[in-house]
Amino acid sequence: MDIARLKQLAGIGENPHFIQMPNPRKEFALRHHERMKLSMNESKPEKLELKKLAYETKDLAPVLSKENVEYHYNILSNGYVTRYNNKEGDPDFNYGGAMLHNLFWEQLQKADGSKPEGAIKELIEDKFGDLNSFVDEMIKTAMTIQGSGWVYLSKSGELKTTPNQSYKTDILMPIDMWEHSFTDYIPAKDAKGKYIKAMMTIVDWNQINMRMGK
């Protein structure tokens, strides 16, 4: 959406009556215009990049199959970046998809039995008691998603959801809850719960600690 259209929606575009507006109305329209600018994130970069995986696509099995990772990363994740860079479709949707997937893939590793340590361990214990309770609460939160979206641990230690590909600046650890993410667990009765529990075994907790330090 260009600035001219933005001004029109805000009521301050090519409006012959704007000049005659009483000052309070002018100020309100200008403030509304500024809020809309902020909500549109005009500071978005011109181009985005899909971060390279720090592991092979087979390394996340059996939590995520090689076929799942290759489709999810090479086709879907790459698609958000490509469409954003080519200015195709909804820029906010594609920007969010690219940002969320970069965080998602970056925080995974080959299962090695590691547990949360350092700052993330302290945060989990402070907010949830222990890792198992944290996972249980994440599953409960994920089950509130209507349609497609993500469940995530926020930087403040809260469990939240975000719809579709809506990127939030408070995201610390996102888990993709679109159906294509947990196809390896369908048709299990509790596919989402099994998927989230399994995902916790391939989280690179050091990566989460690095994010907390930023």
How would you name each of these model-derived features?
Residues 1-44:
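Intrinsically disordered, compositionally biased, charge-dense segments
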Residues 42-214:
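Feature for soluble, non-membrane regions of globular proteins
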